[in-house]
């Protein structure tokens, strides 16, 4: 039988689905991709997995209020019965408790396609129905998202708007990579990509003679071909190392005093902190050695090398996914400011290298495809990481970004396309919190832990069972995603599910805007095309794009250098901070009066690290880097436990310890 071919896209890259007799039999990587991810090989098994949800199902014991343990039986029902139950429950909660009793943030990565992007659709549906409690921030770079605007006036450098790799290759001589440059992490980007270029750019940088230093607990966080100097560091101590480097620059008069004076505010208070003038603790290399495990002489030499040439300081997202995660990013900015390279080609700081595909890749700044999101009439939100706190402690107050809020009393959770039982912290606590709502509704394609802990489960199609348009703001391609097979079982796409619910609740036209699936595919592409036109880039019409399967943006005419305009003229191009400068000391943060985030970068010992009292009983830290062959859901077997030799290793692990690792809390 003839094999049919359909262009498509996943978060780990573009591909062509190969279909025979209605079944996906393989995935052929996109021809333009120099380094396609081998995770594409798993797609046929995922689509045809025995864990697929075949039909709508309702949990036994839901109406009686029995606990959600993840082990109850589900009874399959018709789509009409399931949709009627969902619509009735939404109406009941809205009428009885108000829209702020519904949690609808639905954080998750279900689709690289933007029309069927589940989180966008569930929020659009709930916002148009009166609103809900939304989620803000993210698990990827949430600390940076709210710190960086206080320090440099924008969080865009955290999501990839940083000095281009092309500028680095031409001008940088030394890259200090805190958290390393793990190529395996470059397999994935939200929204997918036409090319995986991280290895390409690293090889170009190496060929250009750039020296690399990888500062990470794992040597494997930098590829062998870089020949990077490895500086093994105790986990969660990067801030102390950066402060000691800053102290070396200051005490040896190697820092750029003129840059600091013109482009920064608050240096004097930070200088006093570095020198220990107020606490009698100089933050020098000897001090940092005791914390980081990096020799004092090595710390001083790193600082001297960075000051002697054009240097780029880059930090992986992992640094700020930890207790006091604001501090290493703030310290990196201040260290880069003292080196004086901010705003110069190949100099300054960057975030996200080694964390995701597309970071720093030269690209015309054209908007990516997305479905429009209306305002949330409920005007209510929580930080994503506080979900369990909210469910367990309704009406309690909490502090966030300098303001005091109260947790809403959630009666209904609506989750589409995500799996919080994978990515939330302290899963045992989350399971307790998950018992609090009266109803949990989930859309998913597989029986994930979240689906098994739901009351009403609606089976959603996978990417290959619907049409879509995908692409990332970090990539130069916009890609057509053709439906390759019929929906499996009774699955429906999220758009059609929400359209049917909106019809039952009286706002179908507002939700669809009289567009069907293909109408929305054309609409989101046309928005990209209009954005490209405004930047002087001509793209073909939708029909040609759909037939050819992709369009590619041309490369930019010149390299992008972060804060280049600001450096050239800080008066005409001030930063969006209160001072218009880089805020080494933030009066706004000082005004928050947070014990765990002072007004300037500082060393704050984490709750868990090798220097804490608990390390006397638990001397072996657990590192949980992203897996090499799977993304962020549940597909794939549990990875083996690596035991790294160390002078701190005092006894072999007991089997009971290894068993407990499976239930450990992850930061």
Map each language-model feature to its residues:
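N-terminal export/assembly segments and adjacent metallocofactor-ligating motifs
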Residues: 1-254, 295, 588, 597, ...
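Conserved active-site and cofactor/substrate-binding residues in soluble primary-metabolism enzymes
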Residues: 48, 77, 81, 116, ...
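Conserved short loop/turn motifs at secondary-structure junctions
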Residues: 105-113, 287-291, 316-324, 355-356, ...
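Acidic catalytic cores of enzymes that act on phosphate-bearing nucleotides/polynucleotides
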Residues: 309-402
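N-terminal leader/propeptide and maturation segments of large enzyme subunits in energy/redox metabolism
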Residues: 62-81, 247, 254-296, 484-587
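Generic, well-ordered alpha-helical scaffold segments in large soluble proteins
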Residues: 85, 89-96, 124-132, 178, ...
């Amino acid at each position: 039988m003839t094999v049919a071919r359909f262009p498509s896209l996943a978060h780990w890259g573009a591909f062509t689905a190969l279909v025979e007799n209605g079944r996906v039999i393989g995935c052929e990587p996109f021809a333009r991709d120099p380094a396609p991810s081998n995770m594409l090989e798993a797609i046929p098994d995922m689509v045809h997995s025995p864990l697929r949800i075949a039909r709508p199902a309702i949990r036994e014991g839901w109406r009686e209020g029995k606990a959600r343990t993840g082990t109850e039986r589900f009874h399959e029902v018709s789509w009409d019965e399931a949709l009627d139950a969902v619509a009735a429950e939404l109406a009941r909660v809205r009428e009885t408790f108000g829209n702020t009793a519904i949690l609808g943030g639905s954080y998750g990565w279900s689709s690289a396609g933007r029309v069927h992007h589940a989180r966008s659709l569930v929020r659009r549906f709930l916002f148009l129905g009166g609103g809900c409690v939304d989620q803000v921030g993210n698990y990827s770079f949430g600390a940076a998202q709210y710190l960086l605007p206080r320090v440099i006036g924008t969080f865009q450098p955290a999501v990839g708007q940083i000095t281009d790799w092309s500028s680095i290759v031409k001008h940088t001589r030394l890259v200090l990579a805190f958290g390393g440059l793990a190529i395996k992490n470059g397999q994935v980007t939200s929204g997918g990509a036409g090319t995986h270029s991280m290895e390409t750019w690293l090889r170009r940088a190496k060929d250009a003679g750039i020296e690399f230093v990888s500062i990470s607990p794992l040597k494997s966080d930098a590829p062998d071909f870089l020949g990077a100097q490895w500086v093994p560091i105790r986990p969660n101590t990067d801030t102390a190392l950066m402060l000691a480097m800053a102290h070396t620059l200051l005490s040896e008069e190697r820092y750029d005093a003129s840059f600091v004076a013109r482009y920064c505010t608050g240096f004097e208070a930070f200088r006093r902190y570095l020198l220990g003038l107020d606490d009698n603790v100089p933050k020098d290399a000897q001090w940092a050695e005791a914390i980081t495990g990096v020799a004092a002489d090595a710390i001083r030499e790193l600082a001297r090398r960075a000051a002697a040439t054009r240097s780029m300081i880059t930090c992986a997202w992992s640094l700020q996914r930890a207790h006091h995660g604001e501090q290493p990013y703030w310290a990196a900015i201040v260290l880069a400011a003292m080196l004086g390279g901010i705003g110069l080609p190949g100099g300054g700081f960057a975030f996200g290298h080694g964390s995701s595909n597309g970071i720093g890749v030269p690209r015309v700044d054209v908007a990516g495809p997305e479905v429009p999101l209306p305002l949330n009439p409920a005007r209510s939100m929580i930080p994503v990481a506080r979900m369990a706190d909210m469910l367990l402690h309704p009406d309690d107050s909490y502090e966030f970004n300098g303001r005091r809020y109260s947790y809403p009393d959630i009666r209904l959770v609506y989750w589409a396309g995500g799996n919080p039982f994978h990515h939330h912290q302290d899963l045992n606590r989350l399971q307790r919190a998950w018992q609090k709502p009266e109803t949990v509704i989930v859309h998913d394609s597989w029986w994930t832990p979240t689906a098994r802990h739901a009351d009403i489960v609606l089976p959603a199609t996978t990417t290959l069972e619907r049409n879509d348009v995908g692409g990332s703001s970090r990539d130069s391609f916009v890609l057509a995603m053709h439906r390759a097979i019929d929906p499996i079982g009774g699955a429906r796409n999220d758009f059609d599910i929400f359209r049917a619910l909106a019809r039952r609740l009286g706002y179908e036209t507002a939700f669809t805007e009289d567009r069907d699936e293909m109408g929305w595919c054309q609409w989101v592409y046309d928005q990209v095309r209009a954005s490209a036109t405004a930047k002087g880039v001509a793209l073909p019409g939708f029909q040609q794009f759909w037939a050819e399967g992709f369009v590619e943006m041309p490369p930019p005419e010149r390299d992008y250098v972060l804060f280049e305009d600001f450096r050239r003229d800080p008066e005409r191009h001030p930063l969006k901070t209160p001072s218009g400068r880089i805020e080494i000391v933030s009066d706004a943060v000082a005004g928050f009066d947070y014990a765990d985030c002072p007004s300037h970068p500082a060393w704050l010992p984490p709750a868990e690290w090798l220097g804490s009292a608990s390390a006397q009983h638990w001397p072996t830290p657990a590192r949980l880097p992203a897996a090499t062959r799977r993304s962020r859901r549940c597909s794939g077997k549990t990875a083996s436990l690596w035991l790294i030799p160390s002078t701190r290793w005092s006894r072999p692990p007991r089997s009971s310890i290894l068993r407990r690792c499976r239930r450990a809390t992850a930061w």
